[in-house]
A protein has these predicted regions:
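FIC/Doc superfamily catalytic core
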Residues: 1-149
């Protein structure tokens, strides 16, 4: 991570901008959803508004545009934590602004794609388990979510 985050004097203005940009995130497809998550997450962590918990808060908040538009959340697996931290650190070392350009998000977005694929596997396994239970009990339920929303 960088040696220095924005000063506490800069944080309110940066967070105002973050909130303004965050409010406009409305992904229409999988690629946009990944990019929205990446931009929201990277910029929040780069602003670093709290003494502790910025990564946890970024992971939570970055999922809201996805959930709001019918996508499942991106869950970063514990086993990928080192790669996650390394990618954020690499971004922050090369950036002069906490707000990433689209091209700067490519490595993090590729990482998120892998993590989201694992999330889909968890969702599909849960749907399979539910379907099997319904079949055994004779109850019909909704069809599983489609991955290509």
């Amino acid at each position: 991570m960088p040696d220095e985050f924005p000063s506490f004097e800069q944080t309110p203005k940066l967070m105002e901008r973050w909130i303004s940009e965050f409010a406009t995130l409305s992904p229409k497809d999988r690629a946009e959803a990944l990019l929205c998550y990446a931009k929201a997450h990277i910029s929040f962590v780069s602003i670093h508004p709290f003494f502790d918990g910025n990564g946890r808060m970024a992971r939570l908040l970055a999922n809201f545009p996805l959930l709001r538009n019918g996508f499942p959340p991106i869950i970063i697996q514990r086993s990928a934590r080192r790669e996650y931290i390394d990618l954020l650190s690499a971004f922050q070392k090369m950036q002069t602004s906490p707000f990433p350009e689209l091209a700067d998000c490519q490595a993090f977005t590729a990482f998120l794609e892998t993590q989201w694929s694992e999330t889909w596997e968890i969702i599909n396994a849960a749907h399979g388990t539910q379907a099997a239970r319904r079949k055994m009990s004779g109850v019909e339920g909704p069809a599983p979510a489609k991955q290509d929303n």
